[in-house]
Amino acid sequence: MNSGQTVGLLVLATLLTGCGTSPPRSPENICEIFREKSDWYDAAQVTQRRWGVPIQVPFAIMYQESGYRYDAKTPRKYLLWVIPWGRVSTAAGYAQAKDEVWSDYQKSTGRNWAHREDFDDAIDFVGWYMDKTTSINGVYKYDAYNQYLNYHEGWGGFRNKTYASKAWLMPTARKVQSRSDLYAQQYAGCKEDLNRGFWSRFWHWL
């Protein structure tokens, strides 16, 4: 293998690595998530400024949707219980965004290069969706319960209360609200430390 091929493979590996990373080791604690993955904290702050959403709600939604797995997909469907026949839906990535709404996001924001497997893009998508939910259905951005119902059922589905016929969905939305509340409490206790920057935190730990 010549030097040009080696460089090419290294560049390709870097690009692939950048698209998605392993889930955080402590997904139950947002402070530990940010300490492990400082780039996720940077992305969360960008999303907060761009869309006016509280940091804890997009994270609570993504925890529920994918468990922070960049390659998460819906279960497969089977023909005659044996032959793989596509998937239950086109939802994919950290945010479990479906093809159609992801395309709407790209067109609306001009982010045509965005990928569902990239965390920065995924959290920006959730922030965009939450902002639209507030505009369309008047749901407060801190209201993780109703934000999640909109996220799951779509804006029209929420208005038509399609969630009422799904006995499992409202308890799931309550879990998202509870996780959002927990994340908010945790973040309040570590925000100052996180905002000090790497070297300030390093000397603080000594």
What is each stretch, according to the model?
Residues 20-194:
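Catalytic glycan-binding domains that act on GlcNAc-containing polysaccharides
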Residues 12-13, 24:
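Residue-level signal for mature regions of secreted extracellular proteins and peptides
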Residues 9-12, 90:
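A generic structural signal for short, non-catalytic loop/turn and secondary-structure boundary residues
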Residues 1-8:
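Bacterial N-terminal signal peptides that target proteins for export
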Residues 192-206:
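Low-complexity, Gly/Ser/Thr/Pro-rich intrinsically disordered linker/tail segments
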Residues 15-18:
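C-terminal motif of bacterial Sec signal peptides marking the signal peptidase cleavage site
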